[in-house]
Amino acid sequence: MLDAFSKVVIQSDAKAAYIGGSDLTALKTFISEGNKRLDSVNYIASNASCIVSDAVSGMICENPGLIAAGGNCYTNRRMAACLRDGEIILRYVSYALLAGDSSVLEDRCLNGLKETYIALGVPTNSTARAVAIMKAAAVAFVTNTASQRKVEVAAGDCSALAAEVGTYFDKVESSI
């Protein structure tokens, strides 16, 4: 995983050039938006269990066969695995948001995820639906439109961060 600073340094070093121009401007923007980014990650982390459990509940409401005998969420062990996977996905999305880079999400979470789910017989359409529900909830927390938020919101527009977190969830959905 490379953060915004490491990327700029590596790119400049490869060109044997000083850091300047648009790279420096982008880093200045990244720093000035840092508190919003930290707050956004905090909103997601502080509400992670609610985000995940609501997503899994929504997935099950739309497909009740998942909790019927033989369903992929039937038995406590399978339900716990489903919740755990949702927590892992959400955690890596928050890491990507913090770094401003999706490589940690792609390398450590999404690489081989679809193949694993197929091998285990996990219905990918239901999983993708749960991810979409998590996306909607996370975006609502970042933009301060969630009805049950637990933390105070810093002043400022977070629509760019909401769009960014949305793209990370889109990557998860498309990889499943």
Swiss-Prot record:
**Which stretches are annotated as coiled coil?**
none
Provide the residue positions that the database annotates as binding (2R,3E)-phycoerythrobilin 1.
Answer: 82
GO biological process entries: photosynthesis
A single Pfam family, by name?
A: Phycobilisome
Modification after translation is described as: Contains two covalently linked phycoerythrobilin chromophores and one covalently linked phycourobilin chromophore.
This protein's record includes keyword Metal-binding: no
Q: Where in the cell is it found?
A: Plastid, Chloroplast thylakoid membrane
Q: Where does phycourobilin bind?
A: 50, 61
Keyword Chloroplast assigned = yes
- Please provide the record's keywords in A-Z order: Antenna complex, Bile pigment, Chloroplast, Chromophore, Electron transport, Membrane, Methylation, Photosynthesis, Phycobilisome, Plastid, Thylakoid, Transport
User: Where, per the database record, does this protein carry N4-methylasparagine?
Assistant: 72
InterPro entries, alphabetized? Globin-like_sf, Phycobilisome_asu/bsu, Phycobilisome_asu/bsu_sf
Residues the entry annotates as binding (2R,3E)-phycoerythrobilin 2: 158
Looking at the UniProt record for this protein, which Gene Ontology cellular component terms does it annotate, in alphabetical order?
chloroplast thylakoid membrane; phycobilisome
How does this chain sit within the bilayer? Peripheral membrane protein
Origin superkingdom: Eukaryota
Q: Into which family does the record put it?
A: Belongs to the phycobiliprotein family.
User: What is this protein's function?
Assistant: Light-harvesting photosynthetic bile pigment-protein from the phycobiliprotein complex.
- Note the subunit structure: Heterodimer of an alpha and a beta chain.
Its name, as the record gives it, is: R-phycoerythrin beta chain
- Tell me the lineage of the source organism: Eukaryota, Rhodophyta, Florideophyceae, Rhodymeniophycidae, Ceramiales
